[in-house]
Amino acid sequence: MLRDGNEGMSTIPGFNQIQFEGFCRFIDQGLTEELHKFPKIEDTDQEIEFQLFVETYQLVEPLIKERDAVYESLTYSSELYVPAGLIWKTSRDMQEQTVFIGNIPLMNSLGTSIVNGIYRIVINQILQSPGIYYRSELDHNGISVYTGTIISDWGGRSELEIDRKARIWARVSRKQKISILVPSSAMGSNLREILDNVCYPEIFLSFPNDKEKKKFGSKENAILEFYQQFACVGGDPIFSESLCKELQKKFFQQRCELGRIGRRNMNRRLNLDIPQNNIFLLPRDVLAAADHLIGMKFGMGTLDDMNHLKNKRIRSVADLLQDQFGLALVRLENVVRGTICGAIRHKLIPTPHNLVTSTPLTTTYESFFGLHPLSQVLDRTNPLTQIVHGRKSSYLGPGGLTGRTASFRIRDIHPSHYGRICPIDTSEGINVGLIGSLAIHARIGHWGSIESPFYEIYERSKEVQMVYLSPSRDEYYMVAAGNSLALNQGIQEEQVVPARYRQEFLTIAWEQIHLRSIFPFQYFSIGASLIPFIEHNDANRALMSSNMQRQAVPLSRSEKCIVGTGLEHQAALDSGVSVIAEHEGKIIYTETNKIVFSGNGDTISIPLVMYQRSNKNTCMHQNPQVQRGKCIKKGQILAGGASTVGGELALGKNILVAYMPWEGYNSEDAVLISERLVYGDIYTSFHIRKYEIKTHVTSQGPERITKEIPHLEANLLRNLDKNGIVMLGSWIETGDILVGKLTPQTAKESSYAPEDRLLRAILGIQVSTTRETCLKLPIGGRGRVIDVRWIQKKGGSSYNPETIRVYISQKREIKVGDKVAGRHGNKGIISKILPRQDMPYLQDGRPVDMVFNPLGVPSRMNVGQIFECSLGLAGDLLDRHYRIAPFDERYEQEASRKLVFPELYEASKQTANPWVFEPEYPGKSRIFDGRTGDPFEQPVIMGKSYILKLIHQVDDKIHGRSSGHYALVTQQPLRGRAKQGGQRVGEMEVWALEGFGVAHISQEMLTYKSDHIRARQEVLGTTIIGGTILNPEDAPESFRLLIRELRSLALELNHFLVSEKNFQINRKEA
């Protein structure tokens, strides 16, 4: 139980703190622990000994900056140097040198690592904690069978089972079960020691017969029996030292390694006092586990809940990096051992520099960050996405679960999750419940458990202390919920309050309360904490909102929300998109790309991000927010980033919405918008695409970047400079050349037809020795070139080619087909853009900006959007911003309604507009049809809502083709927008054509215009020379494909012609 220093006060910890603490723990402890495990290495003759002196290792500051690493596609890492010594045992001479072990990727201020120029982040994994767990299952006869499962540190399982006759069996890796006395004897205990150290010796002596007693009468017999069962070998193995070593290596060192966490859990569960440094399974553990299992059979003890968080552990970034570092050192050990033996064999004098190479460590970390499932590319769609990504927790990954095998019970919410893992924020689809998000106050403890803070309540004292509790501790306390979440400490507590105790929710007297929650948002993640009035929403819609806020596109002109929750400031601050003053000073001058200020006697220049592309093609940009000559304080915002205004998160826009049907254009989650959102650039966003080309050295020669491209129109090359690269500021259309490149090819005259060679000889045309492989702008990529980067190769190696990257910016207004969403799970697709004069308008003449379907509210139970809409209207008229904590119903009933209506009433009084608050239908107003000027029949809910534009945009999804590529084997059109793919006319489309009786059109769709190869060619020739298009005689390729697939299933499909005269069957070949 840990106490915080500030009594009675709590601040929200940094959202990136978990990543920072994990990496610091790896640097401070993990590196040293693994280096101390590095053994002394000797040659085969034991004449030379190599060892590392790990006490004085050094990590060197990186030579490049973060921006340069991203720009040049390098890894932002630190070099690790360790003193090493080589000792000649015969002469007692020692040669000591500081050797370079390798590069360790560092963590930047965002909690991420830069590997090969890409921001990557390591997410936390939730695993079953090592130890022993008891459970009960019913067999086929309906009788309870008790088992104890021992889980090792790496995830291996061994089971103890007690049957109906009270016999205890052991099972390793789901193999055949053996008597518990066999592994106990094989681990070094004789029968007398076993009987002296158990509570139920009569049960251990009851079931072995004389034949079985011989198996564990001695340690050798027990080892042979255990090896025969464990290794599944036939015959009678012979006892030997090699057999003991193999068993020791394969079983006792791998499957019986508990680790420090497993040793602690085993001691607590079985009431043992084995030292913490003994991390392997001992015979004493096995006997105590069997004793406890017998007690379970007799009704003593409690079963374990495998889904309780006290039985889980977090595998953080520190553990993963330490595991990889240990793996790299094992590889380095093998390299050093092989190099020493090779040097002695060739009679060379080795040195520590010659023995150690940096390849194992560097390649291990590169493969880890590039291939490991828990190492992911940082999602940088908007600032919220960056900080949420690092707080994810996953049950998936090596040693964990899979999306197809995880049960519903594992995915479900558990009472121990409260205050630790958000019960709302999870992914949708097959991974639902398996990928969660940590609560905002949660932290990872020393033993890998998720801890949550509480206020400790004293009966005789009014002082309050904050304590952090692990899941195994807080279930023994009465934890108050409900009104104990009150922000105001002076509120008089009621006599009876709701509380949580031992995974149950009770209502008890206030005097019995031990702990209380510290914050209303304590149970939620960052995404869920940004939803106002979340208590009025269905949890499924809150889940959708948490995910959709991470998909919001940064707009060209951001606007902070009128109705918020108060966490917007810290979310923007911890995201790192804003520039914060590190100390006091005075601004000397500001430019669009840098801020220069003086402080502490130094002049500091801070570079700003200028139109930087994120990995989701959104635009990251920083704008100075301070003026020349102004004095600044430490912590003040110097420049705002994308989707931030005034240091607060600003993902969307406050626009005027109405909930009403409009000619069916907003049915089924469709949304009707005004053209003001288009022409006023309300939802305009910038997107930056990257196009890349590399030059290689081929077998015919090197590829060339040039402007002189033969056989191409000059119009396509108009934007290239003299080097053949597109110029900055050029406007590029689809099909234009971005980089001109020629690839050499061999010219063989024999490959041409005789008439071609004759024509070339007459006209004097030279055979081309190059082919054009230019970088062309694909469909949908039109825009303005904002940056060109030519990364030159170093050292002239053909394996490190030159790379040219072209960045093109697109300005996208909102259009039909784009996806918009609110913060309450209310999402929709733009169906129509109306002129502003046709939109419904209010009584003061203002036209509505967006029209939602009112039927989408009651069935989905996300009523929070109605409160936000009405309160946003009042805030817009009163020029106020509201920051509302959730669960305000704890103060009184209808608290949210009592908050909104007085604000509407005040806005109505101050603006002299009685329609803002009408007592007959509060929150609603009569609005008018913009086309006719007539009022609608019923009053309509309207107000200001905060609406986001999501990254699912029609420009990235719409696709069509008239002709394109076909698969070579199946002759079917390719699939996907990236391959310029298409679709066949399907079954339902054929039904539609049949319904209209258009037989010829239907035949064309299935033959000429589809995959009938010969018919397609005949149509082309007939169209050129004229004539009648003949009907196809044979089947199209799709029918042939069906026959081939049936043949692959051993089904032969033939067709026959039956004669009408004699009914003889004449077979015709297909």
UniProtKB/Swiss-Prot annotation:
GO molecular function terms here?
DNA binding; DNA-directed RNA polymerase activity; ribonucleoside binding
What's its catalytic activity?
Answer: RNA(n) + a ribonucleoside 5'-triphosphate = RNA(n+1) + diphosphate
Q: What is its main location?
A: plastid
Oligomeric form and interacting partners: In plastids the minimal PEP RNA polymerase catalytic core is composed of four subunits: alpha, beta, beta', and beta''. When a (nuclear-encoded) sigma factor is associated with the core the holoenzyme is formed, which can initiate transcription.
Family, as annotated:
Belongs to the RNA polymerase beta chain family.
Keywords attached to this entry: Chloroplast, DNA-directed RNA polymerase, Nucleotidyltransferase, Plastid, Transcription, Transferase
What name does this protein carry? DNA-directed RNA polymerase subunit beta
**Superkingdom, natural source:** Eukaryota
Which organism is this protein's natural source? Chloranthus spicatus
What InterPro entries does this protein's entry cite?
DNA-dir_RNA_pol_bsu_ext_1_sf, DNA-dir_RNA_pol_su2, DNA-dir_RNAP_su2_dom, DNA-dir_RNAP_su2_hyb_sf, RNA_pol_bsu_bac, RNA_pol_bsu_CS, RNA_pol_Rpb2_2, RNA_pol_Rpb2_2_sf
- Give the top-level enzyme category: transferase
> What Gene Ontology terms for biological process does this UniProt record contain?
DNA-templated transcription
PANTHER family referenced in this protein's UniProt entry, alphabetically: DNA-DIRECTED RNA POLYMERASE I SUBUNIT 2
Tell me the compartments it is located in: Plastid, Chloroplast
An example Gene Ontology CC term for this record: chloroplast
Instruction: Keyword check for Secreted, yes or no.
Output: no
What are its E.C. numbers?
A: 2.7.7.6
Q: Which Pfam families does the UniProt record give?
A: RNA_pol_Rpb2_2, RNA_pol_Rpb2_3, RNA_pol_Rpb2_6, RNA_pol_Rpb2_7
The keyword Plastid appears for this protein = yes
Q: Relate the protein's function as given in its record.
A: DNA-dependent RNA polymerase catalyzes the transcription of DNA into RNA using the four ribonucleoside triphosphates as substrates.
